[in-house]
Every structure is written in structure tokens, then in C-alpha cells.
Amino acid sequence: VIIGVADWGFDYTHPVFYDTLMNNYRVLAAWDQYRSGFAPPENYDYGAYIEGRDNLLSASCDTNNIYDLGLHGTHVASIAAGGGAGTKYRGVAYGAELLFATWLIDETNVLDSYSWMRDEAKRRGKRLVVNNSWGIYHFGAMDGTSLFDEYVYNLSQEDSVVFVSSAGN
């Protein structure tokens, strides 16, 4: 299983992103939609696609923005899949691999991040669970008819993507 985290504030170097014995780095790739200096992901024309342990560790972290000057993404990814950094304190799916998306504050961009995660998981032959632990606002009507809601529903139905959302921050 791959856990995709759509958020801000990822410290790619954090020890919780290794396995419980601190031997294997589990972050597969990140898409920082703010960053330049790396090529964007395939089929997209913005942001930076960073793949592989050495590239991620060299990049160090995602781009700070006004919505998260700290490490919220690292925090919620740790709850979902933290390896424990050699301690007994681990995330729920501590053996899962990870994808991170730091998305621009726009409905289209967050939906792009979901599609990117789906494509990455398919390419690797893995199931995908997407974590959304942000409570800034909702896109569109809150009755299930918004573009956002319909897109999430379709990814869930057509591609068996599981979405997990916090009940608030």
C-alpha cells in the first residue's frame, strides 16, 4: 500500500520516514507544486517532481508557504505511516510507502495531486490511500455535488483509491 499525503510542510529528511529499524527510506516521490529547479511530473507543466531517496534528501523539504510555515505534512504523515525512528511510537501503517504532494491553494491543483498519486501508485502496481488532514476550507457546495466531491467519488469508484480526511484541525 502507498499512502499519499496532500498537505504542506514536509521534512523529507525526518527519521520517521524510514522503516522501524531505520534502514530503508520509504518516501517514493514528492510533487511540490510551488517549487522550480526540478522537472514537473509527467503530464503536468508546473511544480517539481522529486523522486528517489537521494533526490528527496538533497531537496530536504518542500516549499514553505503562508499556510504552513511549520511541518504539518510531516506530522500527519507520521501519524499515518511513521516508522517510529527506532522507538515504539509508530504510525498506523508504519510499513507503507509514501507519496507527498505540496499543493497550490486551488481546487484544480489538489485534484491534480490526487491524479498524480493515483498514476504513481498504478505505475508501481500498488493500492493507494490518500490522507487529507487539512481543515482550511471546502471546495464548492458541501452537498456532494461540487467538482471536488465528484472527482474524489470517481477516483474512489473507478480506481479504488481510498480517501481519509480529518474531522478538523
Where does each model-flagged region fall?
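Subtilisin-like serine protease catalytic core
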Residues: V1-V110, R124-V129, E158-S160
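Substrate-binding/access-modulating region of protease and related hydrolase catalytic domains
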Residues: G83, W103-N169
